[in-house]
Each structure stands twice: as structure tokens, then as C-alpha cells.
Amino acid sequence: MDAKADLLSMTIEELENLMAEMGEQKFRAKQIFQWTNKGIKDIDAMTNLSKDLREKLKERAYINRLEVIKKFVSKIDGTIKYLFKLNDGNIIESVLMQYLHGYSACISSQVGCKMGCKFCASTGVGFVRNLTPGEMLDQILTIQNDTKNRIGNVVIMGIGEPLDNYENVVKFLRLVNHKDGINLGARHISVSTCGLVPEILRLAEEKIPVTLSISLHAPNDEIREKIMPINKRYSIDKIIEACKIYTETTNRRITFEYAMIDGLNDSKENALELAKRIRGMLCHVNLIPVNTVSDTGFKRSSREKITAFKEILERFGVETTVRRELGSDINAACGQLRRNLVENGQLVY
């Protein structure tokens, strides 16, 4: 017998095919889709389905269920960091952030990461597997059900490289954007990447106008290769060229994420070099005071250096912001909670 299907990972079209195989009417697919996207975890809770259909459905399918292992709530601004256990026992993280315009969730796309970025805690214990579309969607549903707050923005910027899990991430984008599901507009979704050029170009053709966030973190290849091994495959010039094609195709502004690391990439000369490379592009730069990860040796730039860097970029017409620091009293780099649990067998926070 084939393995059971996760209803949360299925499109309405896939559910329609399942209903046809089961000898059921097509409209049942939409009902099931609406139930799963409300966060229902029990097929028996689908009260507009007959008991007979529910029993048959349980033989063929299940609903993905995340378990909240731990959550940390900021006393300063209400930011919540979640540690989730997956069905197979693997661990991922998500974060809920509150802004003036509403709630934003930062979700994971993989268990671990292959990319090896030196300043990131996610890559420290290696790559395990990709997340399914349902596991990505369930992060949003579980947070919404836990907090009773509707999430208005999603950033796929947690553990993992989203474009390394391309097919599942794109399917997730279509699921979360569906009018009969969460119905989150594509313009309220950001997809982060360290710069997988072929996948950036593929994403441009998907006709899902999400915001693309590039983890750039350096003004030149020499510095970037020290902290991001992916740069040996895809240089900054190649990434920028792909970004220009993305903006031309989608008419969406690119965000360049830039972690400010003391003494490495934060000089006035670095700012000038970056400004000259990207001026005139439909883009904006988000400066990030780097998180401290115990074994990297990296320290965040001073406030004065960050301000000077920002002013130089703006002088060249590059729109620039400094990421607002949320949850500073529960501060941990993305992936740090999972890493502590995997390496030490306990939560060290």
C-alpha cells in the first residue's frame, strides 16, 4: 500500500484527483482544503464530510502536525520564538514578530542547511532534509492557532536555504496564496536566498510576485567568499545580473540583506563599493547588526559605523534601512535554539 498523503501539502487539484480515486464528488476537495487551512488536525473534525468519507480518508491520508516544544516570549515587544518538533522527530524554528501593520512570521524551509555561511547558526549541525509544503504551511497555522492572531506577512528566512528546496517552496507559495486557504497575497511574502542564480531566474518565471531578499553581506567577491562558500559558484556580478532580470520580469523591488560585521565588511570604503555596484537598481538595502553566534568570532558593527554606512548608500540614491531589533531580551541567532538542542541534548538559552 502506498504511503499516506499529507492533506496539508496537497493542492485542490490533487485533492480532486484523490476524491475521484475514492469515488467521491469533486466539491469535497475544496471542503477538505478549507478545513486543513483552518489548522484542523483531526479528519473527524471535518463535520461537513460524511462519516463514511472521513473513515475512507483516514485510510489514505493524514494531516501534518507540528508539536510546540518550547516558546520564548519577549517581555519587551511580544516577539515569540518557537521550537517545533516534526512528525519524524526533527527540530525546526519559527519566529512571530509584531509590527505596527500587523504580525509577521519568519519560517524555516529545511531541517539544517547545506550552504555553510560562516555567521549563521543554522548550518552548524549540517543538513538533514527538506521541509514539505505542508510543514512550511503548518508553521503559520500553528502560530495563528496558538496566538489567535492572523499573520499578515511571511518571510522564508528561518532555517535553510529556500531556493535549495525549490519545488516544495514554490508549492508552498501557491498554497498559502490560494483564495480558499490562508489567502496571503504574494506581495506579503519574502523569499530569502544566499544567491542560487538558476533558481532566482526560475522563480522570476513562476508569476508569483514575491519579494526576493538576497543575503549579500559583502561588497565584493573577496570578502563574500570568506563568509559565504556559495560565492565560489555564483559571484556577486552573476547574482546582481539575475536580480535585474527578476525585477524586470516581476516589477518587484529586490532587498539586499547585509549583516554588519565589525572589521570585515563595515568600512566606508565597503559602503562606497556596494553603492556603486547597485545604484540605479530597483532595490533597497537592509543593514543587519549581526547576531552573536558563540563560535564564529564575529562581532556586530558599532552604531556609528552602521549610521555612516547607511548615509553613504543613501547619498548614492540607494534606499537603506537598519533592521529593527525585536525580542532583544530573548536574543538568539536563527538556528541557535535548534543547534543547542541537537548538540547538547537540551535547551541552552
Curated annotation (Swiss-Prot):
Cofactor note: Binds 1 [4Fe-4S] cluster. The cluster is coordinated with 3 cysteines and an exchangeable S-adenosyl-L-methionine.
PROSITE patterns hit by this protein: RADICAL_SAM (PS51918)
Record's subcellular location: Cytoplasm
InterPro entries: Aldolase_TIM, Elp3/MiaA/NifB-like_rSAM, Methyltransferase_A, RlmN_N, RNA_MTrfase_RlmN, rRNA_lsu_MTrfase_RlmN/Cfr, rSAM
MF terms (GO), sorted A to Z: 4 iron, 4 sulfur cluster binding; metal ion binding; rRNA (adenine(2503)-C2-)-methyltransferase activity; rRNA binding; tRNA (adenine(37)-C2)-methyltransferase activity; tRNA binding
Keyword field: 4Fe-4S, Cytoplasm, Disulfide bond, Iron, Iron-sulfur, Metal-binding, Methyltransferase, rRNA processing, S-adenosyl-L-methionine, Transferase, tRNA processing
GO terms under cellular component: cytoplasm
Cysteine pairs bridged by disulfides in the record: 106-334
Enzyme Commission code(s) on record: 2.1.1.192
Main location: cytoplasm
Signal peptide: none
Gene3D superfamilies xrefs: 1.10.150.530, Aldolase class I
Record keyword Cytoplasm present: yes
Main enzyme class: transferase
Active site location: 93, 334
Binding site for S-adenosyl-L-methionine: 160-161, 192, 215-217, 291
Any one GO BP annotation for this protein: tRNA methylation
Domain Radical SAM core intervals: 99-329
Family: Belongs to the radical SAM superfamily. RlmN family.
Something else known: Reaction proceeds by a ping-pong mechanism involving intermediate methylation of a conserved cysteine residue.
Protein role: Specifically methylates position 2 of adenine 2503 in 23S rRNA and position 2 of adenine 37 in tRNAs.
Protein name: Probable dual-specificity RNA methyltransferase RlmN
